[in-house]
A protein has these predicted regions:
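Hydrophobic alpha-helical transmembrane segments
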Residues: 1-174, 178, 186-324
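Solvent-exposed interhelical
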Residues: 183
Length: 324
């Protein structure tokens, strides 16, 4: 039942994406984080240790609450009718996955350039990256879009599928809460260096396995989408650790090698130049078509993840059933 529900949610995500008018659980999570942050900061001592403790409470409480709430809803739906539980789990899976939205927002950058030039493209890419886009040239904008697809292939699709297949919608929603916490408070700036410490470390931990599986799946599907599997494997082995995060360079290095591009490197954040190592080799100049190539790679790896993770769950269920 869970496998079919997740597959239905995945299909719905590819078909419909995230309509702006539809309420989304991530928005609710964001509001809960904002609400809880102020109260937790006031409830704990105003010291580094106290602030870290407050952040730890939030890092544990929100994913647990989201998972339990989802489990409760599914349980109530199941008491009414098994079919209603299936629909609810498929709906939750649809809300958790972000393949279509990642594709739409990245391709919108190239579309903006074709319609409005560099200024429009900078504005479009500014919606999906945290760096200062006003200083980017054409190649810089295209590179930022490709990097976004590569970095979020795991967080937005593969990792949610991984946890959905392990623990259904409750575990998938708990993962989404961890991911949302990291995106909101997992920064190493003055405000969040202590409060966001637990959230950032938890996000690193839960993404450790999925990010590596995502990179391997990207390499595996390269021949299907006409990209360089050998190059992807070579650059992944060489550059997968070239990032401050233990996970971010996994998929980025595989994508860079598959496309024959050099990604990452120095970038401007809040008016300051941040030095970061490059990933990949500049076998050729980046072009606007690389955004579409990166999205095809992401989508192919996502479908592969659905099949592989679903088959693994089915095998475990059958094995457990045979032992019973």
């Amino acid at each position: 039942m869970t496998i079919l529900a997740v597959a239905a949610g995945f299909a719905a995500d590819l078909a419909f994406g995230d309509p702006r008018w539809l309420p989304h659980p991530v928005v609710a999570m964001g509001r809960a984080i904002t609400w809880a942050e102020g109260r937790l900061r006031r409830a704990f001592p105003q010291t580094p240790a106290g602030t870290r403790a407050a952040g730890l409470v939030l890092a544990v409480a929100l994913p647990l609450a989201c998972g339990l709430l989802t489990w409760g809803i599914l349980h109530l739906c199941g008491m009414v009718h098994p079919g209603l539980r299936f629909v609810a789990e498929a709906w939750a899976s649809y809300q958790i996955l972000a393949a279509c939205e990642l594709r739409r927002q990245s391709l919108a950058v190239a579309h903006a350039f074709s319609k409005g030039g560099l200024v429009a493209a900078r504005e479009a890419v500014g919606l999906i990256v945290g760096r200062d886009t006003s200083v980017l040239d054409e190649q810089g904008v295209a590179r930022a879009a490709v990097e976004t697809v590569a970095e979020n292939a795991s967080d937005g699709v593969t990792a949610p599928l991984f946890y959905l297949m392990i623990g259904g919608a409750p575990l998938g929603m708990a993962y989404k809460a961890v991911n949302t916490l990291d995106s909101m408070v997992g920064y190493k700036n003055e405000r969040y260096i202590d409060f966001g410490c637990a959230s950032a470390r938890l996000d690193d931990a839960v993404n450790w396995i999925p990010s590596r599986l995502s990179a391997l799946l990207m390499i595996a599907v390269c021949p299907i989408v006409g990209l360089d599997a050998r190059g992807a494997a070579r650059i992944w082995r060489r550059d997968r650790r070239r990032h401050a995060s233990p996970n971010a360079a996994q998929t980025e290095s595989a994508c860079a090698g598959a496309l024959g591009l050099r990604l990452a490197g120095p970038a401007v954040y809040f008016g300051k130049l941040v030095e970061k190592p490059t990933i990949g080799d500049a076998s050729r100049e980046i072009e606007w078509g690389d955004i579409a190539r990166a999205t095809r790679l992401m989508l192919a790896a996502s479908v592969c993840a659905l099949v592989v993770f679903g088959a693994a769950r089915a095998a475990v269920v059958l094995a457990v059933g045979a032992m019973a």
